[in-house]
A protein has these predicted regions:
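Acidic, polar low-complexity linker/tail segments
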Residues: 3-6, 15-56, 62-70, 85
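Von Willebrand factor
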Residues: 41, 48-113, 115-163, 165-166, 174, 203-209
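Acidic/histidine-rich, surface-exposed loop or edge segments in extracytoplasmic proteins
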Residues: 49-63, 124-132, 304-310, 316-320
Length: 385
């Protein structure tokens, strides 16, 4: 009997010890907190998305180049628009970097050369920097500017990406410590095409003209020359207001994580509406992929996870399914608006082409200007344009 009692005591003790030390973890209490969007990790810095075209625009900002700078301001969006579409109509994402050279306000030790923006798809940033440029006489080291752009910028090594340096100026091309041959060879070694554009204003010399023709030969391009003092006229169309309204609606569909909103330059760039670039800007921006827009990331399958606390207000209180449904709905709306803008722009371009033929005295935008030289020159040097 005593043996049975000891056996029962030992068994009870074993059960107690098991319950004490091997108890399964308690189930966490359920909460009503919404789940996080299920995708990977939101990066500390939102990286630029993949691009198809990279362009470094290098402008002479010496004292005689006010006209060149103004043409770049009014035609930047037009030039980018040209590069966004391939011959078969495929859309491409374009990144632009801006340099200035030949300005006495710049550091002599830097060769009177300054990088104003990295290669970026934030074209509003490029626009704002263009409007900040002020001309002033200085040494114009064009080959050195090309060399710096090749070495300093984050060029994509993928062969499928078109890479182009556009440099415009009016003084002798061979000035400075870097030879033209060295600059063009360095660009070629890095699979970067170079398009020299000579600014043939009243002060340009025959010696300078000859040096830019030689530069075009070294670059393997046709010689391009512009009149930097030509005033660029713009024709309105009956479709402009509708394009701007559709673009406004497109902007309303975008969703940003907390701290990752739209470009800090967006509002300032929009202030240049009165300068005649608003419609071109709307068309270009409707085609560009925006790496900070959660809707765009979702639609392209590149959306990464966003902690609930960083979600914008319209998503934070929703369940995970409701979040996905909302992004899907906005993505569909974006695609619809982009298509409508493309159709309106096709009608706009057709209308403007027709108007230009009806006005014999009208000098179309870009004839003898930076825009036209860029368009014709790019066709000659880029493999997929």
């Amino acid at each position: 009997m005593r043996y049975l009692w000891y056996s029962m005591y030992a068994f009870a003790t074993a059960l107690a010890l098991y319950a004490l030390f091997f108890r399964p973890p308690a189930k966490a209490p359920e909460t009503n907190q919404p789940e996080t969007v299920v995708i990977e990790t939101w990066p500390e810095e939102v990286v630029e998305q993949d691009v198809d075209v990279q362009i470094a625009l290098i402008l002479d900002t010496s004292s005689s180049m006010d006209g060149l700078v103004e043409q770049a301001r009014t035609q930047l969006w037009e030039m980018v628009s040209e590069m966004q579409l391939t011959a078969d109509g495929r859309e491409r994402t374009v990144a632009v970097s801006l340099y200035q050279y030949g300005n006495s306000r710049l550091q002599k030790g830097d060769g009177f050369i300054e990088n104003l923006t990295p290669l970026t798809t934030d074209l509003d940033q490029v626009t704002v920097k263009l409007y900040s440029l002020r001309t002033s006489g200085g040494k114009e080291y064009a080959p050195m500017a090309i060399k710096r752009a090749v070495e300093e910028l984050d060029w994509n090594s993928n062969d499928s990406v078109d890479k182009l340096i556009v440099i415009a100026g009016n003084e002798g091309f061979g000035q400075g410590p870097v030879s033209p041959a060295e600059a063009f060879q360095l660009a070629a070694d890095n699979d970067i095409a170079v398009l020299p554009i000579f600014c043939a204003n009243r002060g340009a010399s025959q010696t300078a003209l000859s040096s830019w023709k030689s530069a075009a030969t070294l670059a393997g391009t046709d010689f391009e020359s512009i009149d930097p003092d030509q005033e660029i006229a713009k024709l309105d169309s009956p479709y402009d207001a509708a394009i701007l309204e559709k673009y406004r609606q497109l902007q309303e569909t975008k969703v940003y994580a907390e701290g990752h909103g739209q470009s800090a330059y967006c509002q300032e760039a929009e202030s240049y509406r009165e300068r005649g670039v608003a419609v071109e800007r709307a068309v270009v921006q409707s085609r560009q992929s925006h790496s900070k827009d959660l809707v765009n990331l979702y639609g392209s399958g590149r959306l990464e996870s966003v902690p609930t606390a960083q979600l914008p207000a319209q998503l934070r209180a929703k369940s995970q399914k409701a979040q996905m449904d909302y992004l899907e709905e906005q993505n569909a709306r974006q695609n619809e608006l982009k298509q409508e803008i493309a159709e309106l722009n096709a009608k706009r371009e057709q209308h403007i082409d027709s108007r230009m033929k009806e006005i014999p005295a009208y000098r179309p935008s870009g004839r003898g200007s930076l825009g036209t030289s860029f368009k014709s020159g790019a066709k000659g040097v880029l493999k997929s344009y």
